[in-house]
């Protein structure tokens, strides 16, 4: 198992480099992107609709940002499940934000064309200047494009160590971190900070990127013996994998569940309509920073009652979920995501909710756990690919 721990650490270190790349983006482009968002959000009118146009894990990275906009600002978010034609009204302020690494996702390009055809504003984040999405938005007078040169599933670059960068991971992770970092720049612009766009230093953005990078390095220092036991419990099983989470943690969970499919495992998102009941041999993997999320806690009880294993991912050792796992003698089945000491108190203050409604605390807190959980689960996938003898080519064949 030493080789697997090395793979975990190398995969985590690689993702740290992905995050650190964001600090090297052209600040003029970062400023322009932040200004364009602030211009829309600070414009006249109280009916602001933001359409998130993306697919797969890119969509989950974008939807996390939409939650931030909805929680902190007076914005109504729409996703690809809410077609543009259904919600778009010219009496509203409409902004489409598209994320497409290749720029060739048909459904995304269709909705980009819809928004352009209706005269709405359009922003695109892509890795491909030669893609269709880039051409559509770059040629549009109310559109702008930001290039993040991250690897996508369409890349054929042979110089990368594929086992440490499962296809599609780099671009989606960088988009997730970028959008969470750029959000810190928006309030100052809405409050009328002085200075021309090109002269702004983007200190809040850069501080967030450095913070994400520091947090990422903590993951590579997780207890190797505990990780080894966790891997041994997680991978060698023939039962079904059920992954769950709520809010932004739920978006990370959905991305993680997709990767089990690529590892040729039978997996389900907990809240899908076709998710079966737990049975002996299954494993439930709830992802919850606080460890007190009502839905996850109830999912744990349900799984245990029906004979399934439970392997939570959390950051709060004093949570009710961890207390239950300790009571059952299954404390070794918990994976603890490390965060800086100053953040532990934030998670320990979160109390269990009594309904599906997310607490005010949970909605407003800094999304550091979701960034770390994304990095951790990506590294777990790299370990799983090696443990199960999966080659990247085989994983691609299982990719939608």
What would you call each of these model-derived segments?
Residues 23-46, 218-237:
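A short, well-structured juxtamembrane/interface segment
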Residues 13, 17-24, 42, 74-75, ...:
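Generic secondary-structure signature for well-ordered alpha-helical cores
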Residues 41-42, 47-55, 197-211, 217, ...:
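Glycine-rich phosphate/diphosphate-binding loops and the adjacent beta-loop-alpha structural elements
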Residues 1-25, 198-219:
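Generic N-terminal amphipathic, Lys/Arg-enriched alpha-helix
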Residues 5-16, 30, 34, 62, ...:
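A general structural signal for well-ordered alpha-helical segments in protein cores
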Residues 38, 42-184, 246, 251-382:
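Glycine-rich phosphate-binding loops that contact phosphosugars or nucleotide phosphates
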Residues 181, 188-207, 379, 385-400:
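A short, charged, Gly/Pro-tolerant segment at domain boundaries
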Residues 15-18, 33-36, 65, 111, ...:
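A ubiquitous structural signal for well-ordered alpha-helices
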């Amino acid at each position: 198992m030493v080789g697997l721990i090395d793979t975990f650490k190398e995969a985590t270190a690689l993702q740290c480099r992905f995050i650190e790349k964001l600090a090297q983006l052209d600040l003029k482009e970062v400023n322009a992107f932040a200004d364009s968002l602030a211009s829309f959000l600070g414009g006249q009118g109280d009916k602001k609709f933001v359409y998130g146009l993306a697919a797969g894990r890119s969509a989950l990275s974008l939807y996390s940002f939409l939650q931030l906009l909805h929680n902190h600002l007076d914005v109504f978010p729409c996703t690809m499940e809410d077609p543009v034609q259904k919600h778009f009204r010219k009496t509203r302020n409409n902004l489409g934000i598209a994320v497409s690494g290749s720029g060739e996702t048909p459904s995304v390009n269709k909705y980009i064309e819809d928004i352009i055809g209706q005269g709405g504003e359009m922003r695109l984040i892509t890795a491909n200047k030669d893609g269709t999405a880039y051409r559509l938005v770059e040629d549009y007078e109310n559109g702008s494009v930001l290039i993040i040169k991250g690897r996508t599933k369409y890349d054929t670059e042979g110089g990368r160590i594929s086992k440490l960068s499962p296809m599609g991971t780099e671009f989606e992770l960088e988009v997730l971190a970028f959008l969470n970092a750029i959000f810190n720049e928006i309030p100052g612009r809405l409050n009328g900070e002085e200075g021309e766009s090109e002269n702004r230093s983007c200190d809040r953005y850069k501080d967030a990127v450095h913070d994400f990078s520091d947090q990422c390095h903590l993951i590579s220092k997780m207890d190797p013996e505990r990780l080894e036991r966790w891997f041994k419990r997680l991978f060698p099983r023939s039962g079904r994998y059920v992954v769950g989470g709520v809010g932004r943690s739920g978006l990370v969970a959905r991305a993680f569940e997709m990767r089990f499919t690529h590892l040729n495992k039978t997996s389900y998102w907990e809240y899908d309509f076709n998710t079966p009941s737990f049975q002996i041999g299954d494993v439930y993997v709830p992802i919850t920073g606080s460890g007190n999320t009502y839905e996850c806690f109830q999912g744990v009880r349900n799984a245990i009652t029906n004979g399934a294993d439970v392997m939570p991912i959390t950051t709060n050792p004093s949570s009710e979920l961890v207390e239950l796992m300790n009571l059952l003698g299954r404390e070794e089945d918990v994976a603890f995501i490390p965060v800086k000491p100053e953040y532990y108190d934030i998670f320990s203050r979160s109390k269990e909710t009594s309904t599906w409604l997310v607490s005010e605390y949970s909605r407003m807190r800094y999304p550091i756990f979701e960034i770390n959980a994304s990095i951790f689960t990506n590294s777990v996938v790299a370990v799983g690919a090696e443990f199960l003898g999966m080659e990247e080519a085989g994983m691609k064949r299982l990719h939608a």
